[in-house]
Amino acid sequence: MQIHINKGVFYSFKIKDRKRLESGILLVEGEDWVLISSIFSDYIVDGYMLINKKYITSIHRTEKEMFTEKVLKASDKTDIVPYIDIPHLSIDSLFKWLEDKHIVFQIDNRDENQCWIGKILDSTKKSIFLTPLTPKGEWDRALYYAFRKANVRIISFNSDYINSLMAYNKKHVEESE
């Protein structure tokens, strides 16, 4: 999808096959992906979200988005500087960066009621293999999930949910091993 959006502006994105809009402040627009500071609900900034541009069906900038942006600006939540530097935000560079940095992230595809959290175990030209992090904060090393890179709609990372599971893992799970 050819899109024209501005950095530092709050938008809502409609993703193919999903009912829920994904909202956030645009940080970077790349070749294949957009990076937003994710606004989970109301005015709560919760990590980063990468949205695959080929699955964006529409972009909303209504009175609701403009009001939300004003509230976020009033509470100094719009001056977000991404701590990541992914060249061109292309599919290849994105997944290489996630793998090289050992980033724990969430993948969302078609079904918005299902997601997978983990880190890249291995990758090929077209696929990634994810070591899953369970809802109990444990690495399931006996299992892996395979995803076609081109089919991934949304990647989220540095969210409170993921960071909480990782903190629990570090404190309780790794200590007991």
Language-model segment annotations:
Residues 1-21, 35, 40-113, 134-177:
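Short glycine-rich, low-complexity segments
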Residues 20-28, 116-122:
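Short beta-strand-centered aromatic/proline hotspots
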Residues 32-36, 127-131:
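Short aromatic-glycine-enriched beta-strand elements
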Residues 102-106, 115-116, 121-122, 127-129:
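Intrinsic, low-complexity N-terminal interaction/targeting segments
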